[in-house]
Regions:
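Generic preference for flexible, low-structure residues
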Residues: 13, 33, 65, 92, ...
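Short, solvent-exposed coil/turn linker segments
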Residues: 2, 53, 89-92, 154, ...
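Glycine-rich, small-residue loops and helix-cap segments
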Residues: 31, 41-44, 114-190
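Short helix-loop capping/hinge segments that flank enzyme active sites or metal/cofactor-binding pockets
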Residues: 4-21, 70-139
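Gly/Ser-rich, acidic/histidine-flanked active-site/gating loops
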Residues: 1-86
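Surface-exposed patches in mature extracellular/periplasmic domains of secreted proteins
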Residues: 51-54, 86-93, 142-144, 157-158
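Proteins with a high burden of low-complexity, intrinsically disordered sequence enriched in S/T/G/P/A and R
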Residues: 1, 17, 40-44, 50-51, ...
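A short beta-alpha structural unit
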Residues: 56-66, 98, 128, 163-165
Length: 190
């Protein structure tokens, strides 16, 4: 299939694209340089670039984390049950890790596993409330409101920076990612 044959070279002419400068990867000069080149390419194709901001940015974080704990347990339990792995659930994995802590957890614990294990099913009111709040803040009051308020056709943001080195002493050196709002909102991020 030749997808390029179907592309319209004038598709971006006149499109208003919101640039989310505060919601992507922070302090990554190579990423910023690549992003600037991409913005120049969009302008060269006729797009109008507009600085944009999602007013609710970060307000969904607590609700999103609550969702993560519920969904992690639910998803991992389903995966392990079907995988043929020697452990069949998150609860079994936690117990395995405890029994082999010197080998499985020499540098860190399993606090997130244990917090996820303490959550109930995806039908719990707390889960549904967190899901609804996160989606409302990220989608209706976030992405959708930003698009409407500024009459934008799309938003653009760097999705992620380069992988960071593994640091078993100080932990991850995560520098941010622009895909989070789209993931929480349930909207495409391409």
């Amino acid at each position: 299939v030749d997808y390029l044959a179907e592309l319209d070279p004038d598709a971006l002419r006149g499109a208003r694209i919101g640039v989310l400068r505060k919601h992507g990867v922070s302090a990554q000069p190579d990423v910023e340089a690549a992003f600037d080149r991409a913005l120049e390419a969009l302008k060269a194709l006729g797009a109008e670039l507009v600085d944009a901001d999602i007013a609710t940015a970060g307000q969904w974080n607590d609700a999103e984390f609550e969702m993560l704990l519920y969904e992690f347990r639910h998803g991992l339990d389903a995966y392990l049950a079907a995988s043929g792995a020697p452990v069949r659930s998150l609860a079994e994995l936690i117990e395995y890790n405890k029994a082999h802590a010197d080998r499985e957890m020499p540098l860190f614990g399993q606090e997130l596993f244990e917090r996820a294990q303490a959550k109930g099913p995806l039908t719990d009111r707390a889960y549904r409330d967190a899901r609804d709040k996160a989606r409302r803040l990220a989608k209706a009051e976030g992405i959708d409101a930003t698009l409407a308020r500024q009459r934008l056709d799309a938003l653009v943001v760097p999705t992620a920076g380069p992988a960071w080195p593994i640091d078993p002493v100080n932990g991850d050196h995560f520098t941010g990612a622009g895909y989070g709002v789209a993931a929480v909102a349930g909207t495409p991020s391409i």
